[in-house]
Each structure stands twice: as structure tokens, then as C-alpha cells.
Amino acid sequence: MDLVNHLPDRLLFAVPKKGRLYEKCCNLLSGADIQFRRSNRLDIALSTNLPIALIFLPAADIPVFVGEGNCDLGITGLDQIKEAEQFDNIEDLLDLKFGSCKLQIQVPADGEYEKPEQLVGKKIVSSFTKLSTDYFKQLSDKPTNIRYVGGSVEASCALGVADAIVDLVESGETMKAAGLKAIETILETSAHLISSKKSKFPEMVNIIVQRLQGVLAAQEYVLCNYNAPKSIQAKCLTITPGRRAATVSTLDKHSDDEEDWVAISSMVNRKEIGNVMDELKKAGATDILVLEISNCRV
């Protein structure tokens, strides 16, 4: 079935059908209010509130489908985009800040190899043969034997298939359990939102980008509200400058107030909020509140 012609009024959005990115993609789409129900046996789901069809594909195939214009949008790893050589055919719209891992060269922990240069001309196993080949070509003109394996790459050294592997690593625990250690990082990767340069739905693409940016901002920031004497306003604003700027309002002056007061509201990186609250209190701010941001547009 040619979905491009079968669903002419819907933007085709490719997302990973399983694996490390699938669940987080679904959570991201839910946060962006892209509503859908997926049958267990189908790799197509129609959005119930937007003119979008979600196409569930292997992450490695998504850059090709988007790059060739078969899908308008896609979510996949930066590693897969580079491996598929599709950067000339797609727009890299957003780093989605999840699925972070490293494409590393791993060797037996008790072996002789300590530097990548020692592996030139040896047997390397990887699911990323293009990236691996490019890396070793930069090291030497001498050819390196790079073989493709689709899964369980970490077992290759123990089985005698390879002298080293090139594979994605998150925590590194799987590699340690397989008796491997990292000697080089080829690429740091995460999930990215990409679009086809041939998309017929630029307005819907922009809407989705704005929604996803809002979800990411809501995950990254909290809203910090507090009151402060006007005399320390400038100092407080250096502590909470806001994402673009803080919102400052004048408070009604009570009869027993010796000076004017202001209410300040500012977006603060959630990783820094504890220190920010301590600094505000030390500066003389009061009534310091932190509120979650469920969603926003930035």
C-alpha cells in the first residue's frame, strides 16, 4: 500500500516501533496532545485529534523513509541518521534530549588493545558499519575488516568473531558483563526530530515542532514565584533571570511596610531550583514557591 497516496490529507509521522526509544516517544507524543490508539498488530495509527498518521518503523529505517519523502516527520537517533547518510535530504529540527548514549569502540577488558590505532587491520563487528568504516579510514589507509551484525554485538569478541566491537552504550553495564571496556567514543547520540525536505504539510510540521518544544521546556523548567523588597529586585533578578526575562509586578503597599515590594515570577531550570531557592532566601526574598509546568509554548 502506498501510504503517501492512500492518506493524502494526513501528515505521515514515523516513530520507532520498539526498542529503547519507543516508550519515550509515546510519552512525548502524549505530552504534545497527539492522540492515537495503536492496535497490537498494526504499525499504523491514525491520530484522533490531528490530521496525522503515525507509522511505526524500525529506528534504522526512519531516516531513509523521511529522507526519500515517504514520511513527513520522524523520530530516531542521531546515530541512525548519520549511519543512513541522509543529512542532505532531511531537516534536523530538534534534539529531543532523550535516548542519550554513546557509540563506542569496545575491546576485551583483559586483552592487549588500549588504543583504536591498534585495531587498524583487525576484525571489527558492528551494527554501524558506515560510521565504523569512516572512523577507521580516518585513522589509516590500511583497510580494517568491519562486519555487520544486527544484534547481540557484545557477544562477538567472546565468540571469537571479532577483535573489537562498535556499539551503542548507555550505562555500560551490559558491556562490563560481557567482559568489555571502552577505548574510544565515536559519537554521542540522542533522539532527534527530523523532517523531509519534500513535506507537503509545512504548517502542521511547525505546529508539531512548537508542541514538542513546549513539552521539552516543561520538562526542563519549573516556575519560581516569590516576593521581595524592591530594593533587592535587581539582585534577585540576577538569581532568576528567567528563560527570556522574569515577570515583575508591584505589590500593594501595606501600612506597616517600610518600602515597596514586588512579586517576581521566573522560569528556572529544575536541576538548579534547590540552589536558586537558597540564594533567594539568603538575598531577602520571601514566600518562595515552585510550581510545575505541565505544558507551555516557548
UniProtKB/Swiss-Prot annotation:
Chief place of localization: cytoplasm
Enzyme Commission no: 2.4.2.17
Keyword Zinc included in the entry's annotation: no
SS bond partners: none
Keyword list, A-Z: Amino-acid biosynthesis, ATP-binding, Cytoplasm, Glycosyltransferase, Histidine biosynthesis, Nucleotide-binding, Transferase
One biological process term in Gene Ontology: L-histidine biosynthetic process
Principal EC category: transferase
Cellular component aspect of the GO annotation: cytoplasm
Pfam family, one: HisG
Compartment(s): Cytoplasm
Keyword field contains Oxidoreductase: no
Pathway assigned in UniProt: Amino-acid biosynthesis; L-histidine biosynthesis; L-histidine from 5-phospho-alpha-D-ribose 1-diphosphate: step 1/9
Catalysed reactions, as listed in the record: 1-(5-phospho-beta-D-ribosyl)-ATP + diphosphate = 5-phospho-alpha-D-ribose 1-diphosphate + ATP
PROSITE patterns registered for this protein in UniProt: ATP_P_PHORIBOSYLTR
GO molecular function annotations of the record: ATP binding; ATP phosphoribosyltransferase activity; magnesium ion binding
Summary of the function given for this chain in its UniProt record: Catalyzes the condensation of ATP and 5-phosphoribose 1-diphosphate to form N'-(5'-phosphoribosyl)-ATP (PR-ATP). Has a crucial role in the pathway because the rate of histidine biosynthesis seems to be controlled primarily by regulation of the enzymatic activity.
Family of this protein: Belongs to the ATP phosphoribosyltransferase family.
NCBIfam families the UniProt entry points to: hisG, HisG_C-term
Protein name, entry field: ATP phosphoribosyltransferase
Organism expressing this protein natively: Candida albicans (strain SC5314 / ATCC MYA-2876) (Yeast)
